[in-house]
Structures are given as C-alpha cells and as structure tokens.
Design a protein with these regions (language model features):
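Electrostatic, structured charged patches in enzyme active sites and in nucleic-acid/phosphate-binding
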Residues: 1-143
Length: 143
C-alpha cells in the first residue's frame, strides 16, 4: 500500500461483529447507517476494482469502502474530500458507476461518541487490532 494523506484515518482498525473496519468513520457508518437500517451490503474491497491513472501516469486500482445495492460508498472526512487524490479516485468511481448503472457517494458520517464506542467495546461488539487496542485502553484509561 501507499502512504495515506496527512490527516486521513483516525487510527482505529478492528472488527465489528464479523466486519472489518479501517477507521472510526467506517465503524460509525456500519453501525449508524448499515446496521441501524438493516442494509444488505458488501465491502468494496474484493468486490470492485476500479482502474485509474495516477498523477505520474501509472495505472492503479481503487476499491470503495462499501457496496450497498447499486450504490458505491466511500467514507472520507470532509477536510480530505477535495484533495487531489480523493478527487481522482472519485472521478474514476463516478465514471465506473455511470457505466454500470450505479451511484457513487462520498460520505463523511457522524462519528460515534466516546461513550458509544466504549459501550460497544464493553459488550465485545467491537474488537480493535492489537496496536489500536492498546491506544484505546490508554485513551479511555480503562484496565
């Protein structure tokens, strides 16, 4: 993989039920939108690979975060949505969607509160990868 842009990813990865999440935003979207509305979905990775041409002319692949019905969903904070790389991928995804009767959405979901995260963790509904587990326990100062 390539290095992420400055400020991307808020440092939390793990599992919610059997679903892998790569950020608090993805986790929040899984819980507040997908789970709450019982939506049928699949991860974009492994389902869709969209070719795009990088700034240096090399061809790369992009996979969205979620596929929900005919919608392709990418989760990004507002502050990163206008960055050149996100725009490049969004353009490729939009063209792909146009040719495949799909819609592309770039979404910045409302993030779960600290209390909601801690409750999910306490009920063992979420499990962080080891390095994030340590960070989580330090942040919440819980044994």
């Amino acid at each position: 993989g390539k290095p992420s842009p400055q400020g991307s990813g808020n440092g939390w990865s793990g599992w919610y039920k059997e679903w892998y999440f790569r950020s608090l935003r993805e986790l929040s979207y899984m819980i507040n939108v997908i789970n709450k509305n019982s939506l049928d979905w699949k991860p974009g990775e492994g389902s869709v690979r969209i070719k795009y041409t990088f700034f240096d002319g090399t061809e790369r692949n992009y996979s969205p975060d979620f596929i929900i019905g005919n919608k392709m969903i990418e989760i990004k904070p507002k502050k990163l949505q206008a960055t050149p790389l996100v725009q490049l991928k969004a353009k490729a995804a939009s063209e792909y969607c146009l040719n495949n009767q799909m819609e592309f959405e770039l979404i910045d979901p409302q993030i779960l509160t600290d209390d909601e995260i801690f409750e999910l963790y306490s009920k063992k509904e979420i499990k962080f990868l080891d390095r994030y587990e340590k960070k989580f326990l330090e942040r919440y100062n819980k044994p």
